[in-house]
Amino acid sequence: SDRVIWSEQGRLHLAYTATNEDVSANIFTIVNDVDGNSVGADHGIRVGDMVLVSSASLTLRGYCSAVSTNTATILPYAEATFDSAGFSDSAGAGAYRILVIGSEFEKGTDGRSAANSPKFKSHSNKHIIMKDYYEVSGSDTTQIGWIEVAGEEGQSGYLWYLKAEGDTRARFTDYLEMTMLEAETAVTNAGAIGGTDGGALQDGTQGLFQAITTRGHQTTGVTGVNAATDLAEFDAILAVFDQNGAIEENMMFVDRGTSLAIDDMLASMNSYGAGGTSYGVFDNSEDMALNLGFSGFRRGSYDFYKSDFKYLNDKGTRGALNDTVTNIRGVVIPAGVSSVYDEQLGRNMKRPFLHVRYRASQTDDRKMKTWITGSVGAATSGKDVMEVHYLSERCLVTQGANNFMLMN
């Protein structure tokens, strides 16, 4: 009950990396699926399958004539053996790719001898408990000032402690979001609290950035070198999306430098903007300033909606970090929902790709709890103070992380 557990279905089609066990006998050893997960004897290649087999320089079509544990015998259609086609026993592990494209059977033969079942990959994350606290003496709660105080949380009045309490609340709510972005799980024997339980209940929780780093994709492109280079690097991002879920609509949350680099890239492609004849908003009036700040655009078959990420720019948050090598410049997040199997509820359901899970019951909701103790107002203790407590228990669920992109 301390973890959120969900399962995501693997790819529909069967594709693997393989090593050529014996090219003269056309035997391949299956190593991993195309996402790098070890499969071995659990591969889905069956006798009768028609496949594509590729090396770095050649693709052949073949027929699977035999399967034994983690190996498959594949007979090429256009060659006597893969050896004669230029394949080598000395190629490294995973040097070849095998893709199942169909099947072929002789007249009057029996059907399949084995069935393929969907493969699911289970993921989990751990709730963490976050707390904060504000205290003011009973005497100070009675000090009325001459200037009205108004805070970001909507509090107002002539009591100065309202401002401090409101700031504490605002800071805590910011921490709730920042933790969901930045948190990571402690590894065994890590210096952080705990992390010594062999991974069963690691301390910490997997935030968005760690989820994308471990299960998603990363890019160092689109840095503003020049428009042509940025465009080529952006197209490389599209190629990665093509290989995965190909979610059409995506949100881009980026820092100022990356935002301007994307604007420059798009402006260079806009002949009107480059020629100075497009005046942007307000019915394209020539009396208005030229608008080169692009908030949404389409490239290939994808729509992107760009937004400046204040968290990455503000000197009070990540903008204060001096890391110029691995610092995060932005994140691309797919819009919409995905279908997953919730192992705790025992059913399939549609959830947003990115959402927060909280601990709650009919008697207690720990999404955001606030309570007051002390002797101010209704006394709950003998302490001459007013204590304001804040608590939340939550974790982030990043579904389909292979559709996310982190910009470093």
What kind of region is each of these model predictions?
Residues 326-327:
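Short, surface-exposed, low-complexity cationic segments
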Residues 1-296, 302, 308-318, 322, ...:
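Flexible, glycine/threonine- and acidic-rich loop/arm segments that mediate assembly and lattice contacts
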